C-alpha cells in the first residue's frame, strides 16, 4: 500500500474528528494517472504490520464464535455439586427406565399366567389318556389366539406411529394483502479489499468465510474509519457486529502500543451477546496483538477486575457490571476512551438500562467517537442519540420494521376452545415437519419454557432451554450444544431474540406471539440471516389478529396459514396426558433442590462472615441503584411493555423521578402550564375571569381609581358572576326550546329513558345549586 508521509505517523486516536492531516488515521492511497502499484519486498512487511502476524492456509472456514473455552473456565470456578442433586436429563432418563421396567414386568406377568394355565390343563389331562389329542388341539388354538393378539397390538402401535408421522393431512393456504410491494433495486457492493482494510484483517475475514461485505458494512466502515459519529439502523442478520468491529480493529493496528489504555468500549444488552461479540472479535484480531476483555455478570468479579487493571484495548461489557467496576474498583476509569459503541440500543433501553447508559456516557470524554447501532429507531433511541452523538451521519439499510426477503412465514391459527392443545400442536409439527434440527422455539414465560423442555425430553426429542432462571454456565452450555448440533431444538425466552448469530438455524417457532412488531422481527431474525433461506411458524390466537394483519401487509413474500390435522393433535394430547405425573414429580424434585441450594448459599455467607470477622473491615460496596429502585424500574418497564396491567396494585410505589432526583414530569408541566389539571370548562371559566378582571382594571386606570380598593374588587367579581349567569340562562333557554320542539315534532309523550335523563339533569342542577350556596356562605364568612 502506498501511504502518505503525513498519515503514516502514529498519534493518539482522540483527535480523529479533526480535519488536520496529522491526526487523521485513514490510510490514503495516491493513485496517479498512469502509475501502477509495486509489490513490496518481504523485508518491508515488518514496517507495515505488527509483530506476531502469521498466516496459515486453511480450507475450512472458521466459525465466528465459540463458547467452549469460557464454559471450561466457569466450570473450574464453580463449586462441586452437592449430594442428592441430579441434572434434568438424569431425571428424565430415570422416568424412562422406570417405564421400560414396568412394561417388561407386565409382559413377564402375562407370560407366567399363560404358562400356569397351560400347566394346570396339562396336569388335569394326564389322568385321561384318551383326551390327549383334544388337549393338543386346544393348546394349538390358544397359541394361535396369542399370536393374533400380539399381531393386533403391533398393528395398533404402527397405526399410532403412522398417525403421528402423517405429513399430507396438513392444509396450507396463502394469505394475501392488498398492498403492492415495491421493486427492490440491488446495488453493487465493494469488496473488503476496496474498503482499505489491512492485510491481517483481510486474512482473518477470509478465514472466517466472509466473501463480500453486507450493505451495512459497506456503508458504515468508511464512515467509521473517518472518525465520524454514526447512527445506523438495519434489519437483524445484516452483519452489524462486523460493521463496527472491523473499523475499530483497523484503527487500533496503528495505535501507540507502548501506552496502555482502554481505548474502545462496546456496550451490549445481554451476556450472550457480549460473549458472542468478544468471540467474533478474537477471531478477527487473531493475526494482531490487540487485547480485549469481557465484563458481564455471572462471572468472577475479581478476575474481571484483574483484567481491567491490565488496560486492554477493547472492553466488551453489559451496563450493570461495568458500572459496578467503575464505582468500586480503584484506579479503573474511562478517561482515555476514544471510541464508544452502543450495539442493540433499542434493546438496551427496553431492558431498563437508560440511567446506566447516561451515567456511562457522562463518564466518557467528550472528544470521543460514538457509534450507535439498532434494528429499530423509536423515540427513545433518537433521544439517546441526541445525548451521546455529535453531528451523526445516519446510515439506514432496508426498510424499518420489515423482515428479510428470504424468509418464508407460516401461521397456525388456534381457536379459543383449543388453546390447551398448543403443546400437542407443537409436538406434532416438530416430529413431522420441523424434524431436521436447527429449530428455535420462543415462549413468553420461563415456566412454559421449562415445562416444554421436560415434555420434549420425555418424548425422546433432543432439546435445550435458555432463559433467565438458568445459571450463566447453563445458558452458555445450551447455546454451545445447539451450535454444535448436539441438540435439535432450543426452547428460549426473549433472551435469545436479539443479536445471536447461530449458524444453521432453519426455522423459528413462536409458541407465544410477542407484544409488538419489533419483537416479532427480532425473533424471526434468528433465521434467514446474511442472505440464507429460513422459515418461521407462529401460533396465532384471537388476541393476535391485529399483529397478524401488520405482518401480512409488510411481508415481502406471501405468507401462508397451516391447519394441523386433528388426528395428530389427538395423538399427542393423549401422550402428554400420560406424562403429567412424571412432569409434576420432576418439578417437585427441582423445587426441593432449589431450596437446598438456597440453604447452602446462606451457610456459605455465614461462614465467610465468621471467618472474616477478625480481619480488617473492608470498605462498603457502592451500588448505583438500591434493590427498591431496581424493583421500581422493573415494574415501570413491565408496564411500558404491557406485561403488567397499570391498574394492578404494585408492591412498591413507583417513583418516576429516577435515581438522580430529577423533577417529575407532572411538576415540570405544572410550572409551565398554569391551567394544568383543570378540565376544559374550568380552564375557560378561569380565562374569562382573568380577561374580565384585566378589562376592569384598565377602566379603573382610565377613570383614575385606586387599584387596591377592596370594594371595587368585590364589584368586579359580582359583575363577572352576573355575566356568566346571563350566558348560562340564555344557553338553558335555547336548550329548553329545542327540547320542546323535538317533543312536539315526535308527537307523543316522553319515553322512560328520556324521563330518566331529564330527572338526572334536574338532580344534578339541584346539587350544584346547593354546593354553590355553601361556597358563597363560606366566602362571605371569611371576608
From Swiss-Prot:
Catalytic activity: ATP + H2O = ADP + phosphate + H(+)
Domain Helicase C-terminal: 406-570
Stretches with biased composition (Basic residues): 762-783
Record-listed E.C. numbers: 3.6.4.13
Gene Ontology cellular-component annotations: chromosome; nucleolus
Binding site for ATP: 234-241
Residue ranges of the region described as Disordered: 1-20, 56-173, 665-783
Gene Ontology terms: biological process: rRNA processing
InterPro entries, sorted: DEAD/DEAH_box_helicase_dom, DEAD_box_RNA_helicase, Helicase_ATP-bd, Helicase_C-like, P-loop_NTPase, RNA-helicase_DEAD-box_CS, RNA_helicase_DEAD_Q_motif
UniProt biased composition (Low complexity): 110-125, 156-167
Q motif, short sequence motif: residues: 190-218
Keywords (A to Z) from UniProt: ATP-binding, Chromosome, Coiled coil, Helicase, Hydrolase, Nucleotide-binding, Nucleus, Ribosome biogenesis, RNA-binding, rRNA processing
GO molecular function: ATP binding; ATP hydrolysis activity; RNA binding; RNA helicase activity
Residue span, Helicase ATP-binding domain: 221-395
Start-end of Basic and acidic residues biased regions: 72-93, 688-706, 715-741, 752-761
Function: Probable ATP-dependent RNA helicase. Component of the nucleolar ribosomal RNA (rRNA) processing machinery that may be involved in ribosome biogenesis.
Stated family: Belongs to the DEAD box helicase family. DDX27/DRS1 subfamily.
Comment block on domains: The Q motif is unique to and characteristic of the DEAD box family of RNA helicases and controls ATP binding and hydrolysis.
Protein name listed in UniProt: Probable ATP-dependent RNA helicase ddx27
Amino acid at each position: 500500500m502506498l501511504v502518505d508521509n503525513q498519515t503514516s505517523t502514529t498519534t493518539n486516536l482522540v483527535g480523529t474528528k479533526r480535519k488536520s492531516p496529522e491526526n487523521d488515521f485513514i490510510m490514503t492511497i495516491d493513485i496517479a494517472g498512469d502509475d501502477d502499484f509495486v509489490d513490496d519486498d518481504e523485508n518491508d512487511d515488518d514496517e507495515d504490520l505488527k509483530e506476531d502476524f502469521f498466516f496459515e492456509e486453511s480450507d475450512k472456514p472458521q466459525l465466528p464464535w465459540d463458547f467452549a473455552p469460557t464454559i471450561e473456565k466457569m466450570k473450574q470456578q464453580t463449586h462441586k455439586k452437592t449430594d442428592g442433586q441430579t441434572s434434568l436429563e438424569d431425571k428424565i432418563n430415570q422416568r424412562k427406565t422406570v417405564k421400560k421396567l414396568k412394561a417388561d414386568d407386565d409382559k413377564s406377568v402375562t407370560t407366567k399366567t399363560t404358562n400356569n394355565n397351560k400347566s394346570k390343563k396339562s396336569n388335569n389331562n394326564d389322568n385321561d389318556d384318551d383326551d390327549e389329542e383334544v388337549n393338543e388341539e386346544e393348546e394349538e388354538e390358544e397359541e394361535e389366539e396369542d399370536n393374533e393378539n400380539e399381531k393386533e397390538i403391533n398393528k395398533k402401535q404402527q397405526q399410532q406411529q403412522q398417525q403421528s408421522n402423517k405429513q399430507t393431512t396438513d392444509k396450507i393456504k396463502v394469505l394475501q394483502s392488498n398492498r403492492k410491494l415495491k421493486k427492490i433495486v440491488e446495488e453493487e457492493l465493494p469488496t473488503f479489499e476496496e474498503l482499505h482494510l489491512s492485510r491481517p484483517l483481510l486474512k482473518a475475514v477470509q478465514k472466517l468465510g466472509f466473501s463480500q461485505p453486507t450493505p451495512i458494512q459497506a456503508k458504515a466502515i468508511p464512515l467509521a474509519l473517518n472518525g465520524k459519529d454514526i447512527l445506523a439502523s438495519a434489519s437483524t442478520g445484516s452483519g452489524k457486529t462486523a460493521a463496527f468491529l472491523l473499523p475499530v480493529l483497523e484503527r487500533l493496528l496503528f495505535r501507540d502500543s507502548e501506552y496502555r489504555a482502554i481505548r474502545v468500549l462496546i456496550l451490549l444488552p445481554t451476556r450472550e451477546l457480549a460473549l458472542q461479540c468478544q468471540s467474533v472479535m478474537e477471531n478477527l484480531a487473531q493475526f494482531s496483538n490487540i487485547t480485549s476483555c469481557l465484563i458481564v455478570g455471572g462471572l468472577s468479579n475479581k478476575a474481571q477486575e484483574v483484567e481491567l487493571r491490565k488496560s486492554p484495548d477493547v472492553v466488551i461489557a453489559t451496563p450493570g457490571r461495568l458500572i459496578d467496576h467503575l464505582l468500586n474498583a480503584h484506579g479503573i476509569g474511562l478517561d482515555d476512551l476514544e471510541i464508544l459503541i452502543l450495539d442493540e440500543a433499542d434493546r438496551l433501553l427496553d431492558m431498563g438500562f437508560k440511567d446506566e447508559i447516561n451515567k456511562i456516557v457522562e463518564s466518557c470524554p467528550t472528544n470521543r467517537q460514538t457509534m450507535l447501532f439498532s434494528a429499530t429507531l423509536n423515540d427513545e433511541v433518537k433521544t439517546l442519540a441526541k445525548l451521546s452523538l455529535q453531528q451523526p451521519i445516519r446510515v439506514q439499510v432496508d426498510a424499518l420494521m420489515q423482515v428479510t426477503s428470504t424468509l418464508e412465514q407460516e401461521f397456525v391459527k388456534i381457536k379459543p376452545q383449543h388453546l390447551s392443545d398448543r403443546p400437542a400442536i407443537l409436538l406434532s409439527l416438530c416430529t413431522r415437519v420441523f424434524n431436521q434440527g436447527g429449530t428455535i422455539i420462543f415462549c413468553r414465560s420461563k415456566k412454559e419454557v421449562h415445562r416444554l423442555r421436560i415434555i420434549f425430553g420425555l418424548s425422546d426429542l433432543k432439546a435445550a432451554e435458555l432463559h433467565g432462571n438458568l445459571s450463566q454456565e447453563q445458558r452458555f452450555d445450551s447455546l454451545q450444544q445447539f451450535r454444535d448440533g448436539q441438540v435439535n431444538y432450543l426452547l428460549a425466552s426473549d433472551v435469545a431474540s436479539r443479536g445471536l448469530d447461530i449458524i444453521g438455524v432453519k426455522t423459528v417457532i413462536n409458541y407465544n406471539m410477542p407484544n409488538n412488531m419489533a419483537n416479532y422481527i427480532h425473533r424471526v431474525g434468528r433465521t434467514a440471516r446474511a442472505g440464507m433461506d429460513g422459515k418461521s411458524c407462529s401460533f396465532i390466537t384471537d388476541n393476535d389478529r391485529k399483529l397478524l394483519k401488520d405482518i401480512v401487509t409488510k411481508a415481502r413474500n406471501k405468507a401462508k396459514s397451516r391447519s394441523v390435522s386433528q388426528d395428530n393433535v389427538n395423538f399427542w394430547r393423549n401422550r402428554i396426558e400420560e406424562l403429567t405425573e412424571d412432569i409434576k414429580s420432576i418439578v417437585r424434585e427441582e423445587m426441593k433442590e432449589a431450596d437446598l441450594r438456597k440453604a447452602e448459599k446462606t451457610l456459605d455467607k455465614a461462614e465467610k462472615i465468621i471467618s472474616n470477622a477478625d480481619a480488617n473491615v473492608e470498605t462498603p460496596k457502592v451500588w448505583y441503584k438500591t434493590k427498591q429502585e431496581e424493583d421500581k424500574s422493573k415494574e415501570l418497564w413491565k408496564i411500558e411493555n404491557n406485561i403488567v396491567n397499570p391498574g394492578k396494585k404494585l408492591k412498591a410505589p413507583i417513583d418516576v423521578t429516577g435515581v438522580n432526583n430529577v423533577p417529575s414530569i407532572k411538576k415540570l408541566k405544572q410550572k409551565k402550564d398554569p391551567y394544568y389539571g383543570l378540565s376544559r370548562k374550568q380552564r375557560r371559566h378561569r380565562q374569562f375571569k382573568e380577561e374580565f378582571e384585566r378589562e376592569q382594571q384598565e377602566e379603573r386606570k382610565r377613570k383614575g381609581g385606586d387599584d387596591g380598593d377592596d370594594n371595587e374588587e368585590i364589584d368586579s367579581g359580582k359583575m363577572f358572576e352576573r355575566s356568566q349567569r346571563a350566558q348560562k340562562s340564555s344557553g338553558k333557554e335555547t336548550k329548553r326550546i329545542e327540547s320542546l320542539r323535538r317533543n312536539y315534532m315526535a308527537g307523543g309523550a316522553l319515553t322512560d329513558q328520556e324521563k330518566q335523563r331529564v330527572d338526572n339533569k334536574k338532580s344534578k342542577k339541584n346539587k350544584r345549586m346547593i354546593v354553590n350556596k355553601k361556597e358563597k356562605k363560606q366566602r362571605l364568612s371569611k371576608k
